[in-house]
């Protein structure tokens, strides 16, 4: 079986680049002079990705240590001020830096933000009202600018990466995004777009069979629409679809679909083993990696050209073991 997700990047001259809040990489840039080093990022993702670190607060000239800042006022357009009530207001400086930086992230294929940060928090950031009470409805100023300027860029915050499903989904989206960027750099063509779709069919099916059919129908109009416009519409929809986690039921549907390609190639005993292990996954008795590994074993013995192209079987490096907990 081919391993497209790795071959295109891991064996090449460059690794996929991820933006990361600097404190998560161990940089002592927090207001108290400390850091929030994240083991998963550094010790696991760090072996496969190149990190580009950002600390908006240090970038605008705030020292370390420094008074902490917090968001106040309107949840939709809060101001970033000192928590000490000393009159320090860095809103404008943060917004200018964030807007300028967010427009220059073309080389990144994903971003991991520091949760709860008034500059980097992706969601549920505290915003204080006049009464001093806080609502957890805000977004950090820098994180908001990055997401607005790069709406298709896969983003997460480190706290959510503790969830195995969210973790696997994020990394999978990063690799899809990277493959798309590589396609665009090599030159968009009708063939390249159709090849991209073909290789991602089962991955899309695992997330949404309806969207999989919708995207196929969209590409069926290639001859009647501008390639650039249609490609943009296509990839926007792909990233929307992949943002929702694939359910166990839909994974089972894909596994059974793959099994169909082996029905004439394997004997009754091996077919029964495959059916049994897929059912064990359906019942939550084994993780997703188990039926996929067994299917890959049989496809190595009985290669199928269409199946060998499917990103679903190898959406990210095996060494990350992201499907071992799904």
Range-by-range predicted roles:
Residues 86-106:
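Glycine-rich anion/phosphate-binding loops
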Residues 17-24:
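Short, hydrophobic/glycine-enriched beta-strand segments
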Residues 20, 113, 284:
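Conserved, mostly hydrophobic/aromatic
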């Amino acid at each position: 079986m081919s391993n497209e997700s790795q071959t295109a990047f891991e064996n090449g001259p460059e690794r996929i680049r991820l933006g990361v809040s600097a404190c998560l990489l161990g940089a002592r840039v927090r207001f108290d002079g400390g850091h929030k080093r994240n083991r998963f990022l550094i010790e696991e993702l760090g072996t496969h990705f190149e990190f580009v670190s950002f600390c908006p607060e240090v970038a605008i000239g705030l020292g370390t240590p420094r008074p902490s800042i917090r968001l106040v006022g309107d949840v939709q357009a809060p101001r970033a001020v000192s928590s000490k009530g000393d009159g320090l207001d860095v809103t404008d400086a943060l917004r200018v830096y964030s807007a300028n930086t967010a427009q220059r992230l073309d080389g990144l294929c994903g971003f991991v933000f520091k949760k709860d940060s008034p500059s980097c928090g992706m969601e549920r950031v505290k915003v204080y009202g006049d009464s001093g009470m806080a609502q957890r409805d805000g977004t950090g100023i820098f994180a908001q600018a990055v997401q607005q300027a790069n709406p298709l860029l896969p983003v997460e915050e480190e706290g959510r990466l503790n969830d195995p499903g969210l973790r696997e989904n994020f990394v999978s989206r990063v690799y899809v995004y990277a493959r798309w960027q590589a396609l665009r750099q090599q030159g968009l063509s009708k063939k390249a777009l159709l090849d991209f779709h073909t290789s991602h069919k089962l991955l899309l099916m695992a997330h949404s069979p309806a969207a999989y059919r919708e995207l196929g129908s969209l590409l069926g109009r290639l001859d009647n629409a501008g390639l650039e416009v249609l490609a943009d519409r296509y990839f926007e929809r792909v990233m929307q679809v992949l943002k929702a986690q694939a359910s166990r039921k839909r994974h089972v549907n894909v596994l059974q679909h793959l099994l169909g390609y082996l029905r004439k190639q394997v004997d009754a005993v091996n077919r029964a083993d495959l059916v049994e292990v897929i059912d064990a996954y359906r019942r939550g008795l084994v993780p997703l990696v188990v039926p996929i590994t067994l299917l890959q074993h049989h496809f190595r013995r009985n290669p199928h050209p269409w199946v060998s192209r499917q990103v679903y079987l190898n959406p990210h490096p095996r060494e990350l073991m992201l499907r071992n907990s799904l």
